[in-house]
């Protein structure tokens, strides 16, 4: 399946166009972008901001800390830092303070024991942020689409309602890429989010506002969604934890756009947080009845796990080469697991991984059980009503008149070219099924796979336009339908986060979550921005 000469020429032209657009974007950034005295926010000085969600909930239940003090500490941090990172795009501070006061009042009036409180409200009083694509009652729900700028959520998305029911207090909603289909979080309504480790770098997408908000200690737990890496890339670029659950476990209802048909299975809603110990409790709440499909209470003996690893995709001509920093960091993990933990570690070469992008496109090209074609992106741009001409929007964009971002215009222009014919779909569907079987057989119920999160650390703004296919390092596991936990592994020499994906077989999420906690203890986990 070597790429044809025509395919190589098309790729070259696409990258050349992306490079030119990137130059325009960088020039705009230099000439008219926001200026800050520092390239990172100030380090955290408030101790309450350095506690996990579980720790905060325990202190609040024990009445050792007032909920209103916790919420106020986060509001103060947001006011100080958010103007730099633009992670939270709409606050609900007044409502949050009222809800915090109600928690304190409830604890003062009712003398329920700690165990009862934990069982009823495991996240009692814990600050929460929510990706803007999810419905949070009374808040905007546009997904960065100008046509939906006046859309206000009348109800809560299912996962938001579950977390609120568990006691969490939403502070606001966070930025995303337009229609959640690009890996830089920027749109015409809210603007662009910036990486707290270096404001000139991206936060990832589409849950990028959530990633930078958590990394900058403006929140402690958050909600994201992932159909190609939209939880994992922001978690990686911002040095936090994120989990893409096994498909079908966590309800997706109440987000826009909501995947339908064959794609519905691949859209996964999941937790994002700074501390690994919050992942499993969040997942238990967010999954609702679906949690029965997982084994989160099963004790994991890490030494008995089988670890497999691969340092790159095998040489796809579409993707960038993996940075040496990331390869060396992965090897440090491998050496530690083998020599210190004493686990079984094996290097593997899965040859079909080099077709990662093609497998993701095949997933997005799949027809539903009713035979219907997938929803067209250009129809989403028009919010299923307004006709949108991608070519005309490109001309308008060049004149500074379009209400759409260039990645969205580009995708609308190219989607018919990208969408596979039935013959091509069947070819790559067979590859996907073969690779999935190979991985599932290899992993069994006691194996995990370590794989790069992305070929590079967080790139500078606009650079993704020149490397549009690099997301496939995460996208492939969406196509394969496997659970993945994104884990931070410190910072590189320039102060940007390093990390790794930990993959398991279907419904073995408990394995990747256990490995995440171990890696956090061993390699330090989240690093506060501004301390580098």
Curated annotation (Swiss-Prot):
Gene Ontology molecular function: any one: fatty acid amide hydrolase activity
Pfam families xrefs: Amidase
Function summary: Catalyzes the hydrolysis of endogenous amidated lipids like the sleep-inducing lipid oleamide ((9Z)-octadecenamide), the endocannabinoid anandamide (N-(5Z,8Z,11Z,14Z-eicosatetraenoyl)-ethanolamine), as well as other fatty amides, to their corresponding fatty acids, thereby regulating the signaling functions of these molecules. Hydrolyzes monounsaturated substrate anandamide preferentially as compared to polyunsaturated substrates.
Gene assigned in the entry: FAAH2
Entry's Gene Ontology cellular component terms: lipid droplet; membrane
Gene3D superfamilies to which the protein is assigned, alphabetical: Amidase signature (AS) domain
Subunit note: Homodimer.
Top-rank taxon, per record: Eukaryota
Residues annotated as catalytic: 131 (charge relay system), 206 (charge relay system), 230 (acyl-ester intermediate)
Protein name, as recorded: Fatty-acid amide hydrolase 2
InterPro entries: Amidase_CS, Amidase_dom, AS_sf, FAAH2
Primary site of residence: membrane
The protein's Enzyme Commission number: 3.5.1.99
């Amino acid at each position: 399946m070597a790429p044809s000469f025509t395919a190589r020429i098309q790729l070259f032209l696409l990258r050349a166009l992306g490079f030119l657009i990137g130059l325009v974007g960088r020039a705009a950034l230099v000439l008219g972008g926001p200026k800050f005295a520092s390239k990172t926010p100030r380090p955290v000085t408030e101790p309450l901001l350095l506690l996990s969600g579980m720790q905060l909930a325990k202190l609040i239940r024990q009445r050792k800390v007032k909920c209103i003090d916790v919420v106020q500490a986060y509001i103060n941090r947001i006011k100080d830092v958010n103007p730099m990172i633009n992670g939270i795009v709409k606050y609900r501070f007044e409502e949050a303070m009222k809800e915090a006061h109600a928690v304190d009042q409830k604890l003062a009036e009712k003398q329920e024991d700690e165990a009862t409180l934990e069982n009823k409200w495991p996240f009692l009083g814990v600050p929460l942020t929510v990706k803007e694509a999810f419905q949070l009652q009374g808040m905007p729900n546009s997904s960065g689409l100008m046509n939906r700028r006046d859309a206000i959520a009348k109800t809560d998305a299912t996962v938001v309602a579950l977390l609120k029911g568990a006691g969490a207090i939403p502070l606001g909603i966070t930025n995303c890429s337009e229609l959640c289909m690009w890996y830089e979080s920027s749109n015409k309504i809210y603007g662009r989010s910036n990486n707290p480790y270096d404001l000139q770098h991206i936060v990832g997408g589409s849950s990028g506002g959530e990633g930078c908000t958590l990394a900058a200690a403006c929140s402690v737990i958050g909600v994201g969604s992932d159909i190609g890496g939209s939880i994992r890339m922001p978690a990686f670029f911002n040095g936090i934890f994120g989990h893409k659950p096994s498909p079908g476990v966590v309800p997706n209802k109440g987000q826009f756009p909501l995947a339908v048909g064959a794609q519905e299975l691949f859209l996964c809603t999941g937790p994002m947080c700074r501390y690994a110990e919050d992942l499993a409790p969040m997942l238990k709440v967010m999954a609702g009845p679906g949690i029965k499909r997982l084994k989160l209470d099963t004790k994991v003996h890490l030494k008995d796990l089988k670890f497999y690893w691969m340092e790159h995709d095998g040489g796809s001509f579409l993707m960038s080469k993996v940075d040496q920093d990331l390869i060396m960091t992965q090897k440090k993990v491998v050496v530690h697991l083998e020599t210190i933990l004493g686990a079984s570690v094996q290097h593997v070469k899965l040859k079909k991984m080099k077709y990662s992008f093609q497998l993701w496109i095949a997933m997005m090209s799949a027809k539903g059980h009713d035979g219907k074609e997938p929803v067209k992106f250009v129809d989403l741009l028009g919010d299923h009503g307004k006709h949108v001409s991608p070519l005309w929007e490109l001309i308008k964009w060049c004149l500074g008149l379009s209400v759409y971002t260039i990645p969205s215009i580009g995708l609308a222009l190219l989607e018919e070219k990208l969408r596979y014919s039935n013959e091509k779909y069947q070819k790559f569907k067979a590859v996907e099924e073969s690779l999935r079987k190979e991985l599932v057989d290899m992993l069994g119920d006691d194996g995990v796979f370590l794989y790069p999160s992305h070929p590079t650390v967080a790139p500078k703004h606009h650079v993704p336009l020149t490397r549009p296919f690099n997301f496939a390092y995460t996208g492939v596991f969406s196509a394969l339908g496997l659970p993945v936990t994104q884990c931070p592994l410190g910072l590189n020499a320039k102060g940007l986060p390093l990390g790794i994906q930990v993959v398991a077989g279907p419904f073995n999420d408990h394995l990747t979550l256990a490995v995440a906690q171990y890696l956090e203890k061993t390699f330090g986990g989240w690093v506060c921005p501004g301390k580098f």
